[in-house]
């Protein structure tokens, strides 16, 4: 594995190539895809990316479809909030 530094983090593997601003964008994406996310099923921070769009929880071993680089996409957050709002409106 390539050497990384404290300052640039995970994108240190690219060295001086591709420009600083592009490396900053890639860093945000790569940090997100390698981090653990909250599992809705068991309540632990164990959701890890297995492949593109496939997320698996290490605690309860449940598999969930999500975004390519992040578990929740912008569209899924919007849909969830809309469903929650409509559900609360019908209950009243």
Curated annotation (Swiss-Prot):
User: What biological-process GO terms show up in the record?
Assistant: translation
| Family matches, as Gene3D superfamilies | 2.20.25.30
Q: Which Pfam families match?
A: Ribosomal_L37ae (PF01780)
Which is a Gene Ontology cellular component entry for this protein?
ribonucleoprotein complex
Kindly indicate whether the keyword Ribonucleoprotein belongs to this entry: yes
In residue numbers, the zinc fingers (C4-type) are 39-60
Q: Does the keyword Secreted apply?
A: no
Keyword annotations from UniProtKB, A to Z: Metal-binding, Ribonucleoprotein, Ribosomal protein, Zinc, Zinc-finger
Q: Which residues form a coiled coil?
A: none
Alphabetized GO MF terms = structural constituent of ribosome; zinc ion binding
Name the NCBIfam families on file.
eL43_euk_arch
What the entry lists under HAMAP family is as follows: Ribosomal_eL43
Return the similarity comment. Answer: Belongs to the eukaryotic ribosomal protein eL43 family.
UniProt protein name: Large ribosomal subunit protein eL43
- The organism encoding this protein is Ostreococcus tauri
The gene behind this protein is RPL37a
């Amino acid at each position: 594995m390539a050497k990384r530094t404290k300052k640039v983090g995970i994108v240190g593997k690219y060295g001086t190539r591709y420009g600083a601003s592009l490396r900053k964008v890639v860093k945000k994406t790569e940090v997100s895809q390698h981090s653990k996310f909250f599992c809705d099923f068991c309540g632990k921070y164990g959701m890890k990316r297995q492949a593109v769009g496939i997320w698996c929880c290490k605690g309860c071993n449940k598999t969930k479809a999500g975004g390519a680089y992040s578990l929740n996409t912008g569209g899924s957050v919007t849909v969830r909030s809309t469903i929650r709002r409509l559900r609360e409106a019908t209950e009243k």
